[in-house]
């Protein structure tokens, strides 16, 4: 998809900011079919490393997925720890099988491992620098993760969390306004409509966005 200069960057352009070789749109860089990323989500690398370098212990045999929505901002050094990092916990945690030389016969089956499922990140999520996201975590739309947080549990939509251990800081909006943002789902609108309404999206003018959405639904 090619957009002219009046309609924002091309989401298929890996390096969308001229002269900046660190900030990269993620989707066009992905080669792993178990990593699914929406358009316009970016990773601001430290030294030009690829986003996939930040997804650790992601083994095909396990089949877990990393799923990220649209318009997410992911800070430098953020890492995603997938289920392959988990060791057995019902006896010794030492991974004898990795060293082979006769120990390979003690390879655990998947049912023996404490698998947590996919990592799922919603849309319009802001993740600060050097955040660690653990296996199976679900982060809701519009959430903010403070720098250097270790995310070990689910994060509700439009909430702010941080720290290690992870702590809830506050909601970004009242419950009613959060429900309105979630119902609106502006990130799923056609890009032409998003561009026309960017002032309202950026300024959080939910009432104007609701009126605009109603007009669209009525046409």
UniProtKB/Swiss-Prot annotation:
TM spans (from-to): none
SUPFAM superfamilies assigned to the protein according to its UniProt record, in alphabetical order: Trimeric LpxA-like enzymes
A GO biological-process term: response to antibiotic
Lineage top rank: taxon: Bacteria
Keyword Protein biosynthesis: no
A molecular function GO annotation: acyltransferase activity
InterPro entries listed in its UniProt record: Hexapep, Hexapep_transf_CS, Trans_hexapeptide_repeat, Trimer_LpxA-like_sf
EC id: 2.3.1.-
Active-site residues (renumbered): 87
Protein function: Inactivates the A compounds of virginiamycin-like antibiotics, thus providing resistance to these antibiotics.
Protein name: Virginiamycin A acetyltransferase
Species this protein is from: Staphylococcus aureus
């Amino acid at each position: 998809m090619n957009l002219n200069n009046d309609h924002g960057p091309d989401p298929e352009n890996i390096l969308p900011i001229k002269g900046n070789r660190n900030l990269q749109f993620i989707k066009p860089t992905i080669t792993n079919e178990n990593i699914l990323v929406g358009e316009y989500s970016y990773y601001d690398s430290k030294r030009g490393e690829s986003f996939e370098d930040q997804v650790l212990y992601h083994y095909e045999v396990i089949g877990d997925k990393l799923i990220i929505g649209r318009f997410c901002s992911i800070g430098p050094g953020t890492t995603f720890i997938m289920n392959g990092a988990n060791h057995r916990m019902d006896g010794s945690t030492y991974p004898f099988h990795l060293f082979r030389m006769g120990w390979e016969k003690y390879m655990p089956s998947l049912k023996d491992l404490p698998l947590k499922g996919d990592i799922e990140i919603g849309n319009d999520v802001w993740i600060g620098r050097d955040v660690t996201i653990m296996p199976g975590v679900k982060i809701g739309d519009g959430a903010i993760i403070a720098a250097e947080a270790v995310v070990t549990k689910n994060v509700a939509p439009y909430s702010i969390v941080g720290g290690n251990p992870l702590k809830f800081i506050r909601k970004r909006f009242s419950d009613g306004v959060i429900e309105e943002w979630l119902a609106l789902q502006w990130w799923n609108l056609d890009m032409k409509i998003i561009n026309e309404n960017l002032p309202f999206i950026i300024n959080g003018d939910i009432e104007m966005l609701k009126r605009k959405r109603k007009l669209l639904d009525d046409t």
